[in-house]
Design a protein with these regions (language model features):
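C-terminal ends of transmembrane helices
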Residues: 4, 54-64
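N-terminal membrane topogenic signal
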Residues: 5-20
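Structural signature of hydrophobic alpha-helical transmembrane segments
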Residues: 16, 37-50
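Short, hydrophobic transmembrane alpha-helix segments
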Residues: 28-41, 59-61
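Cytoplasmic-side transmembrane-helix entry/capping segments in multi-pass membrane proteins
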Residues: 65-77
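Pore-domain transmembrane helices of cation channels
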Residues: 92-130, 135
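Membrane-proximal soluble regions of multi-pass membrane proteins
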Residues: 126-185
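Pore domain of cation channels
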Residues: 164-219
Length: 219
């Protein structure tokens, strides 16, 4: 069996997503307390409490509940990220925090922004990973990945005739979006993807512009 066939016929690996969620909790623990909403341990604790039943429901085949729990986790992390970015923005003009602390915190929040929206894209594209596993369709319904732009008769040459994305592909979209302030690898098809991308770009732009301004002493 070819790699492309395995990519479409096997369920998407979930360990990558679990690792991303755990990484977000770890990043939040590393933030200074003045850049966190509530106690520093609160978000990581919520992640653990919700992640366990999310994994269990997936194993038990409770796909609707699993999808709902995944949405809740993403929503909580997103709200925490927005709250931390607001606190970061508020701390820059007053010059109360050390420049190095601000830069490190900004970098951590920028990375969190990438991971959070990668989770959203993975969770929502085509109805979610479980629905995508059932359909076993080529490509994506929300993004135009480069593999989808290859002519059908040429797909075998590049071993992508039965290709579909997994979490790493969504992570790359999120990374390039935050880095270039716009989608570069895969054009957007779905309106929800466009809305989320605008939110991601706004957050990334806020972090980068304000930190650069602080670094050069403009503010």
């Amino acid at each position: 069996m070819s790699d492309s066939t395995e990519h479409v016929d096997q369920p998407e690996p979930r360990w990558q997503v679990i690792l991303a969620v755990v990484a977000i909790g770890g990043i939040y623990l590393a933030l200074p307390p003045w850049f966190t909403v509530g106690p520093t341990w609160l978000l990581p604790a919520l992640i653990v409490v919700l992640l366990i039943p999310t994994v269990v429901t997936h194993r038990m085949g409770r796909h609707s509940l699993n999808h709902a729990l995944g949405i809740v986790i993403n929503a909580i992390i997103t709200l925490a990220l927005i709250g931390s970015v607001i606190l970061l923005v508020g701390a820059i003009p007053v010059h109360k925090q050390a420049p190095l602390s601000l830069l490190l915190s900004g970098a951590e929040l920028w990375l969190t922004n990438v991971l959070v929206f990668a989770l959203w894209y993975w969770r929502l594209d085509g109805g979610g990973p479980t629905v995508r596993d059932r359909r076993r369709e080529f490509g994506s319904r929300s993004f135009v990945f480069p593999q989808m732009q290859i002519e059908k008769i040429e797909r075998g040459r590049f071993s992508v005739e039965r290709w579909r994305p997994n979490f790493v592909d969504y992570l790359f979209i999120a990374f390039t979006t935050s880095s270039t302030f716009g989608p570069t690898d895969a054009p957007l098809l779905a309106r929800w993807a466009k809305a989320l991308t605008m939110c991601q770009i706004f957050i990334s732009l806020s972090i980068v512009v304000l930190l650069i301004s602080r670094a050069v002493g403009i503010l």
